[in-house]
Structures are given as structure tokens and as C-alpha cells.
Amino acid sequence: MYDYIKGQLTKITAKYIVVEANGLGYMINVANPYSFTHSVNQLVTIYLHQVIREDAHLLFGFHTEDEKDVFLKLISVSGIGPTTALAIVAVDDNEGLVNAIDNSDIKYLMKFPKIGKKTAQQMVLDLAGKFVEAPQETGHTKARSNKAGNTQLDEAIEALLALGYTATELKKIRAFFEGTSETAEQYIKSALKLLMKG
């Protein structure tokens, strides 16, 4: 098992980043790839969790150990796989997540992609009281980009689709942000907050 990787960030896509270490490029699935935009071609440390399947070895990466801890707690719940856990971590509202679990707020938990009533109830059952202290929000850097606003919005929509949100949900998000100019990272953060409000 890997704990973390330290290397040069060489590539960002809507679903993953690539970190080169010792001549190898590691494809790492992350919650919001564009939150790493400010680190392209720089040395980064990414906290890792490895998932070994019959057909693939997958790496999931996190900015902080707190993010990784939330992810590990989520995948311990029956019905939550790594992709769904990553989508929950992407919302970057760990305090809201912990409060919803501790207060049995099933409706809030059901706003996450692929979380139905049964899984939300299981989250409460398995995780209530497991977070001793609410993890801090990661507050990723608000880096600006020279790319056009629509290109950034397209990248954000692609990343949200990868997290499991539907085209119907994202059509409303696109309409809401049309004409604005933000980085893909900021679009993703703002869109996730809107999606959680319902």
C-alpha cells in the first residue's frame, strides 16, 4: 500500500492527474483535478489510497490527510465505492457532511450523487460519532487562468459528469454560470454548493 507520493505534476484531466516520480507517471483519481492547476510542473505531495481490482489497480489522491481520512471512512460504508466517496469529498464541505451524519439528516446525504435513502441511513448508522473533530475544509487555491471562461466551464462540467452528476443536473448549472468567467476549479466548487442546495 502507498501512503503518499511526492513528484512532479505533469498532467491534469477532468478525472485524474498524473504525477511523475522516479521516471514513472502515476495516474491518480482526485476529487477536483482542477484544484491542482496552480501546481502543474511543480513538485507536489499527494496522499494516496490504492484500490486493487481484478481488472485494474487504481490510485485515489488527496490534498490532505484529513481528506483521505474522510474518504476512507466513507468507503467503509456498505454501498459506497471509491468513485462515490470521491464525489462526496469533492463537495469540500466536510463540516456539513459530519453534521448531517451526526444529526441523521438523510435528506442532505441523499443530495450526493448515487446516494439513495438506504445508503444514507447506512452512513448514519456506520459513521455517527466516528468523526471526533470535523475535518477542516481544504480551501484549495483560487488560481486564475488565462483560458476563456467557456472553456473553463466545459472542463468543470466534464469533471462533474465524472463525479456522477447527471447531464440534466448539469444543464441547469451551465445555464446558471453562462457568461461568467472563473477557473474550472471555482466553477466546480460553486456548482457543487448549488447542487447540494437542491
UniProtKB/Swiss-Prot annotation:
InterPro entries: DNA_helicase_Holl-junc_RuvA_I, Hlx-hairpin-Hlx_DNA-bd_motif, NA-bd_OB-fold, RuvA, RuvA_2-like, RuvA_C, RuvA_C_sf
GO molecular function, one term: ATP binding
Cited function: The RuvA-RuvB-RuvC complex processes Holliday junction (HJ) DNA during genetic recombination and DNA repair, while the RuvA-RuvB complex plays an important role in the rescue of blocked DNA replication forks via replication fork reversal (RFR). RuvA specifically binds to HJ cruciform DNA, conferring on it an open structure. The RuvB hexamer acts as an ATP-dependent pump, pulling dsDNA into and through the RuvAB complex. HJ branch migration allows RuvC to scan DNA until it finds its consensus sequence, where it cleaves and resolves the cruciform DNA.
GO BP of this protein: DNA recombination; DNA repair
Subunit structure: Homotetramer. Forms an RuvA(8)-RuvB(12)-Holliday junction (HJ) complex. HJ DNA is sandwiched between 2 RuvA tetramers; dsDNA enters through RuvA and exits via RuvB. An RuvB hexamer assembles on each DNA strand where it exits the tetramer. Each RuvB hexamer is contacted by two RuvA subunits (via domain III) on 2 adjacent RuvB subunits; this complex drives branch migration. In the full resolvosome a probable DNA-RuvA(4)-RuvB(12)-RuvC(2) complex forms which resolves the HJ.
The family this protein is said to belong to: Belongs to the RuvA family.
Free-text note regarding domains: Has three domains with a flexible linker between the domains II and III and assumes an 'L' shape. Domain III is highly mobile and contacts RuvB.
Alphabetized Pfam families for the sequence: HHH_5, RuvA_C, RuvA_N
Region (Domain I): 1-63
Protein's recorded name: Holliday junction branch migration complex subunit RuvA
GO cellular component: cytoplasm; Holliday junction helicase complex; Holliday junction resolvase complex
Keyword list, A-Z: Cytoplasm, DNA damage, DNA recombination, DNA repair, DNA-binding
Residues forming coiled coils: none
Subcellular location: Cytoplasm
Region of interest (Flexible linker), residue spans: 143-147
NCBIfam families for this protein: ruvA
Region spans: Domain II: 64-142
Region (Domain III) location: 148-198
